[in-house]
Amino acid sequence: MRRIWTHYAFGVAALALLLASGSASAWECDFLTGGGFIIRDSGAKANFGVGGGCKHGSPTWGHLEYQDHGTGLNVHWTSITGYFEVDSNTDSRGKPIGARRICGTARTNLYGDVDWFVIARDTGEPGVDDEFTIRLTPLGGGIPLYTTEGDSDHTLGGSGPGGGNIQLHNPNPSTMGPFGGDCPAFPTFTGG
């Protein structure tokens, strides 16, 4: 019986060490940039410019500008609070592809100050099937004030109506650090 408990204790200790060591992702933190436009289900055009990543010496960096020409909404970032890996892979040439969630706060002309997140996906080159989605919530989270999540097409070209490019960049010495941060606009994805 003592032998079983010894093996059990060793297994629990190994699991605790694994969990305490941080993210299970082997992907190094990187950065993402992008710009373009999407066509909302209403037919309105919305332009965006986005960037984000890990930053050596501080947790995250980035920016967001977004304008919906149908509603007149204008969003200007004021801080970046999180940068998260959604999924990662490489294309046939070894270049990184995948999606990232960038989170922050912004001021808007319609809702005042808000929390937000963007999911931006790089599907490879050319960027015709890249994707962009945005959600705005009251500060501290809550029911979305604005979102493109329910729209039928988030692509930036190809067979879709939008245009632009999302580019996931390889890690470099200035983007060292862990994925993570806080994302009140996406409450099940906080901490890090």
What kind of feature is each model-predicted range?
Residues 1-11:
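Bacterial N-terminal signal peptides that target proteins for export
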Residues 9-20:
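Bacterial N-terminal signal peptides
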Residues 23-41, 175-192:
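Boundary/junction segments of secreted and surface-exposed precursor proteins
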Residues 34, 102-104, 134-136:
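Residue-level detector of buried hydrophobic side-chain packing
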Residues 48-120:
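Predominantly extracellular/secreted and cell-surface proteins with exposed
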Residues 59-67, 128-138:
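Short polybasic amphipathic segments
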Residues 113-131, 135:
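A short, surface-exposed beta-strand/turn
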Residues 139-192:
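Edge beta-strand at a domain terminus
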